[in-house]
């Protein structure tokens, strides 16, 4: 390496180095400005909120995306509201092939700054950006079959947004989050329960409204005000563990909430409850030999559950 003394003694060398650095900087600026936005294809990296989980045994559809899953994508001007049409990208379906997400046709950038909005599962025909109807399944015990999602996965609406983006060869990150609420129920054998407790049961969540309206720009689910309260069949995660996706809402009056049916016996728990958006609510249900003496323990909340 040339010392400062040597550089001073050889001003030609120093001047050459300065010119070289300036030349490199000019080339980088030239590359950035020479990017043709309209000829630059969009690419994306997609992250499922459950991707960081390391469970011992969990179905892939609950913790990550699977091959042939589809997300809906909008790309709109950063200084304009998202519209049902007229954006740079309008509800394009991106399909996962097991390694990357690709649209049916190549999507290209344009000049300017944009915001990207994405949701899952994909809805083929949207009717609104601010009030898109959406329903969670009332039978979330069903499993994926062919191209049809299971009841639980079809109910777990995910949303992602990335703002202030422009034409680039770098992929746009889409980090999804849950916008519904989740109730996880763990069945625990009480001290006075005789014999072995069955590893499977029918578990219901009563008196919630399964219909919602979705704001696809804000990523917010709101209970449909004219919706009717219904019962939801929970999904079995493991022995004694069940869960259900619930539209965010408040049950203000005490009423039947959780019912467990095992060996022909019904265990019913009544309560008020607030289902918060993006929150997993954990409850332990203590099963007694006497169905009238069922007890519950609130196990806490997990924000932005994985």
Give the label of every model feature segment:
Residues 2-12, 21-306:
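Sec-type signal peptide cleavage vicinity
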């Amino acid at each position: 390496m040339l010392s400062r003394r040597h550089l001073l003694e050889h001003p030609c060398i120093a001047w050459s180095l300065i010119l070289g650095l300036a030349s490199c900087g000019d080339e980088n600026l030239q590359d950035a400005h020479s990017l043709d936005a309209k000829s630059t294809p969009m690419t994306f990296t997609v992250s499922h909120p459950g991707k960081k989980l390391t469970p011992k045994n969990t179905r892939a559809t609950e913790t990550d995306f699977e091959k042939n899953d589809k997300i809906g994508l909008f790309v709109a001007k950063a200084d304009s509201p998202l519209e049902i049409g007229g954006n740079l990208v309008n509800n394009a379906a991106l399909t996962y092939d097991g390694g990357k997400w690709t649209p049916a046709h190549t999507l290209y950038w344009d000049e300017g700054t944009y915001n990207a909005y994405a949701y899952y599962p994909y809805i083929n025909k949207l009717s609104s950006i601010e009030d898109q109807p959406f329903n969670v399944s009332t039978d979330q015990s069903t499993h994926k079959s062919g191209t049809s999602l299971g009841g639980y996965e079809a109910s777990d609406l995910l949303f992602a947004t990335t703002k202030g983006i422009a034409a680039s060869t770098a992929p746009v990150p889409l980090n999804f989050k849950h916008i519904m609420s989740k109730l996880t129920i763990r069945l625990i054998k009480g001290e006075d329960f005789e014999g072995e407790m069955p590893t499977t049961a029918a578990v219901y969540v009563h008196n919630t409204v399964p219909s919602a309206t979705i704001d696809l720009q804000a990523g917010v689910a709101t209970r449909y005000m004219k919706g009717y309260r219904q019962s939801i069949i929970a999904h079995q995660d493991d022995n004694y563990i069940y869960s259900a996706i619930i539209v965010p809402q408040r049950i203000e009056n005490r009423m039947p909430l959780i019912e467990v049916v095992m060996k022909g016996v019904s265990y019913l728990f009544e309560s008020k409850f607030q289902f918060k958006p993006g929150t997993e609510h954990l409850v332990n249900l203590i099963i007694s030999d006497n169905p009238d003496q069922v007890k519950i323990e609130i196990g806490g909340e997990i924000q932005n559950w994985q």
